[in-house]
Regions:
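Positively charged n-region of N-terminal signal peptides that target proteins for export
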Residues: 1-4
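Cleavable N-terminal signal peptides
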Residues: 6-7, 17
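Mature extracytoplasmic or organellar-lumen-exposed domains after removal of signal/transit peptides
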Residues: 20-338
Length: 338
């Protein structure tokens, strides 16, 4: 009987200790993972808008470089889909993808062909269709061989400047909300706030991790893979700018950082997480295929499928090992919300 009690105590003690660690880990995630990323996003978006003012030519190397840096900064935060990013559909205003009905090129073409005056200010432009806003709309204007030369050049220039300013305004608001009040709401739960306990706060972070991995596997990789008989390379994310693989690399790196910061002080679990993320990134780098064009070739397609399987292995570890450590129920589905 005594041995049984000791065994139970030993089993319960680690979970109690981790329960005491949860507030510290949540604060660590907020201050080391979330806030610096949104600050960088706001800074890079401001730089993009300023660059567009100086040179709005879609062939401009300076504009393309600033666009890439700002888009990278968004990818570094794109998994954090809660709180300030969801106010007024801000995340969708920055990143409307996948666009299954081709709404973005249609919306942009309509603006250009009619020379709609709504582009005169970013404030007014914030009322247009979300499909015509953000980084994916800007990719069409800069890299699409048709849209980049459609209509009046002066109007396209003004449109580029307005979209970049709209991006700056949106990311500045997200960063300000996180810095001024939402960080405190996540780290200091209350009965009147969005999180009533530290457990609810850590579940939000776990959901961001799980959903980010699921989106990478099912959408960023799943869409271009299609089926064996019908691969869809042109469904890859941002293939026009050659960034499809890069988006997965940045996202996995950000999720890696979140997973390790969220994990308890369990060396075996952390080693398992690090190994799984490193393996997926290594397989991704080995593709040497920026836009997943190789999915049409059976032998090369297998390599892309292996990357997807590697991401799914991370998801398994998150669900089966990390989830229970955090006290997230086994039946919790990241796509179901709270």
């Amino acid at each position: 009987m005594k041995n049984a009690v000791i065994a139970i105590a030993c089993a319960v003690l680690p979970s109690l200790v981790f329960g005491q660690e949860i507030p510290d880990r949540t604060r660590g995630v907020v201050h080391a993972h979330i806030l610096p990323r949104f600050e960088s996003l706001a800074h890079q978006s401001e730089h993009l808008a300023n660059t567009a003012v100086a040179d709005c030519s879609t062939a401009s190397s300076a504009l393309r470089s600033a666009y890439a840096k700002a888009f990278d900064a968004w990818l570094d935060t794109a998994h954090l889909r809660f709180g300030p990013t969801e106010v007024d559909n801000r995340a969708f205003a920055l990143a409307f993808w996948p666009d299954r009905r081709g709404a973005t090129p249609k919306a942009l073409t309509a603006l250009i062909q009619t020379q709609d005056p709504i582009i005169q200010t970013a404030k007014a432009y914030a009322e247009v269709s979300i499909a015509a806003r953000g980084f994916y709309a800007l990719e069409f204007l800069i890299y699409d061989p048709t849209l980049s030369i459609t209509g009046d050049a002066a109007y396209r220039c003004a449109l580029v400047r307005t979209i970049t300013k709209d991006i700056e305004n949106t990311t500045t608001k997200i960063h300000a909300d996180w810095k001024n009040h939402y960080a405190a709401r996540l780290t200091s739960p209350s009965d009147t706030g969005p999180y009533r306990s530290h457990d609810e706060a850590v579940q939000e972070l776990f959901k961001a991790l799980s959903t980010g991995l699921q989106f990478t596997s099912d959408t960023r990789l799943g869409r271009p893979l299609g089926t064996f008989d019908h691969p869809r390379p042109r469904r890859a994310e941002v293939w026009r700018s050659g960034r499809s693989s890069r988006h997965i690399k940045i996202s996995l790196s950000a999720l890696h950082d979140l997973a390790v910061r969220l994990a308890p002080a369990d060396s075996n679990l952390i080693k398992k997480l690090v190994s799984a993320f490193d393996h997926a990134l290594l397989k991704l780098a080995g593709l040497n295929d920026p836009v997943f064009a190789s999915v049409v070739a059976p032998q090369a397609r297998i390599k892309v499928e292996i990357v997807q399987q590697s991401v799914d292995e991370i998801r398994r570890i998150i669900t089966e090992d990390l989830g229970p450590k955090l006290g997230v129920s086994a039946g919790f589905n990241a796509m179901d919300g709270d």
